[in-house]
Amino acid sequence: MATCKTRVLALSAAGLMLVLGACSKAESAKTPTDLDVTSASAGHYSLVWEHGGSEKVRVFAATDPKNPAAEGKEIGTVDGFSTEVDGLDPLSRWYFEVIDEDGNSTIASTRHVTLQGAANVRDVGGYETADGRSVKWGLVFRGDRLSDLTADDQQTIENAGIRTVVDFRGDSEIAKDGADKVPANVKVVNTAVLDAGTQALATAITSALKSGDPAIVEQVLGGGEAVRISDTGAVDQLSKPDGMAGYSQALRTIADSESAVAYHCTAGKDRTGLMTALLLGILGVPDKTIVDDFVLSNTYNKAKNEQTYTFLSSKGIDVDLLKPLMEQRPSQIQPVLDKIRDQFGGWEKFSQDVLKLDADTIAKLRSKLLTKQ
């Protein structure tokens, strides 16, 4: 196994600090692939790619995802397969491009968008399709409710280029939690997707939990009812025209928008998860990736969920009854993918027959959101 050493390069002109992981040439014989970007603190990023390029790679950073190498700043040259970047504007969204000496490159950013007032906002970009393309970064974002955004959060939203937000919440949810707090130049499109029956069920569950009475919660969610509700919720939506019309409107909004679009519900996991599955499916992203993205909400909602569990436990409520409704599982979204393929005839037919998207809109989505082959 090759050994690695660390060297520090200070770029005073750019106000940046790089920690460059240098490894032997044996580990850098392939083009840079699978660039993974994480951020442990504001303005600081860790970049890791599976293989270094032809001995060395150049690293670029930009706030526009289209072409960081041409439009951004050069961070430095790395002889290896990882680097740390510090000193970037914490309120901007940064995209990184790694280019080897043969000109092969890859672009990526953090999946998660760190905000103080929302926990589950994510970039939908970077996912690979079955035909070898990938979803472009920085054009579509998914999230939880945006009604608690701070001034800094709003600046981050603006800096990310988001100019349209689709809110899947119903009137009662907006009345309870508040309207989205977004910059003045962001258009909010209210598109409720839950039918009256589903909304009534959600209200009944909320009322049971608010009662603080373990017996009432057991009556509503016990006997496997919570699991049944959870596992059938998304797939049942496929047969509800009003809900599908709402998702269709969101897809048209994405296709027609000249800037980035974000969509969200309350927790950013069920309605938003279904919307993301529909979008990624139309784009040709494999089932496994769609499922992985769906359950990723568990990572970002974990802290809030734990607070809820602690509170309910203090009331004597069995939190295991609630977990199927609070946490995402493959069994919630895989039936959606199976039904679209097996009963609706695949994504093309489902998009046209159920979502009522014409061929031009489908083509526009793919042209706008996918890299070229």
Segments and roles (model prediction):
Residues 12-14, 92:
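Non-catalytic accessory regions used for complex assembly or targeting
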Residues 19-22:
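C-terminal motif of bacterial Sec signal peptides marking the signal peptidase cleavage site
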Residues 267, 271-272:
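Ser/Thr-glycine-rich phosphate-binding loops at phosphate-binding pockets of nucleotides
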Residues 24-261, 274-373:
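Cys-dependent protein tyrosine phosphatase-like superfamily
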Residues 1-12:
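Bacterial N-terminal signal peptides that target proteins for export
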Residues 264:
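Catalytic nucleophile loop of clan PA
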Residues 10, 17, 242:
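Extracytoplasmic thiol/disulfide redox context detector
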